[in-house]
Amino acid sequence: MEAKRNQAEGMKNAVAVVKEIAKEFAGVSGREYGLFEEYCMEDAETAVVMIGSAAGTTKDAIDALRAKGEKGGLIKIRLYRPFPAEEIAEALKNVKAVAIMDRAEGYTNHGGPLGSDVMAAMFRARSQAYAVNYIYGLGGRDVRVEDMEKVFADLKQIVADNDAGETYRYLGIRE
């Protein structure tokens, strides 16, 4: 039992260690990497949270939407464990709706692993933002700019309706 408690304490302390090492790396390389990357979050009304390469596609969708005057943003997770819950909740504090993108099925009937973590972080921070979890890219299926534009359109509709509707969704499934 004591060993498991020590592991848990180590995980609590790991975020500070990661931040310290990231500073050292920035000093050597000139590149800064935080716990997550924020893209266009400074004035975002809606946001996507995700891990991985589809963030590039999402940035393209955000750029297209911002050209039309819509304020979307992105949080790309870099450190998943220990999960930076407080930092993520802080980054999302001003959005009205957020889509959490999971590339893995959770088999829980209420969301994928990232969705569960982000929603728990938002709950603990008493966030008033609507949150929906999308499962996408299963089996290696590509996500397209149009897919991410649809996600942002869904978020815009959620804000307009003042209702998240179904919070556990699939993106790009053939029906």
Where are these regions (language model features)?
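Solvent-exposed alpha-helices and their adjacent loops that cap or buttress functional pockets
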Residues: 39-43, 90-92, 123-125
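Conformationally flexible catalytic loops at phosphate/diphosphate-handling active centers
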Residues: 1-37
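Short helix-loop-beta junction
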Residues: 20, 28, 60-74, 123-124
